[in-house]
């Protein structure tokens, strides 16, 4: 049996242990996934959040695992899942795991703005928190694309029905303006 096949079987067993309902197996699987998990485990882990198979404490442990992922290619996979309509129910949880993460999501600035304008209040709040914590630097095209999402939002809706969301969108617009100014300043230094 090849090394890849053994790894896949091990991950399958660990994912089964997460669903077992046995806390001892669950905790052992979490510890093992912290060491042996790879990009292929992210979607099944998020999928588990959609079910009622986890106790509240196990659910919290699983969310913590997602928040502490240290895989360099995790941001691409997480963003793919966030945009997947099958996971809308757990989107705020996944967004929260991003701003708790140590991974760099700066490349996805415009994606967060898009989610903020299209999502509900909670999505917007989570995206604002993420954007506030992005380190950059930001590519000019991402800032421009993000500004276009804001402009389209303002032009198409005029005003959101949720005043709280409108305040958050305004804060995002100010952050984008600051990011744009920071880029201009860096060009002249």
Task: Tell where the protein language model's regions lie, with residue ranges.
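Short, amphipathic alpha-helical segments
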Residues: 88, 92, 106, 118-125, ...
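Structural detector for internal amphipathic alpha-helices that build alpha-solenoid repeat scaffolds
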Residues: 1-5, 26-37, 47, 57-71, ...
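Amphipathic alpha-helical scaffolding segments comprising HEAT/armadillo-like alpha-solenoid repeats
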Residues: 2-17, 36-50, 71-84, 103-117, ...
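Short, low-complexity, intrinsically disordered N-terminal segments
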Residues: 16-28
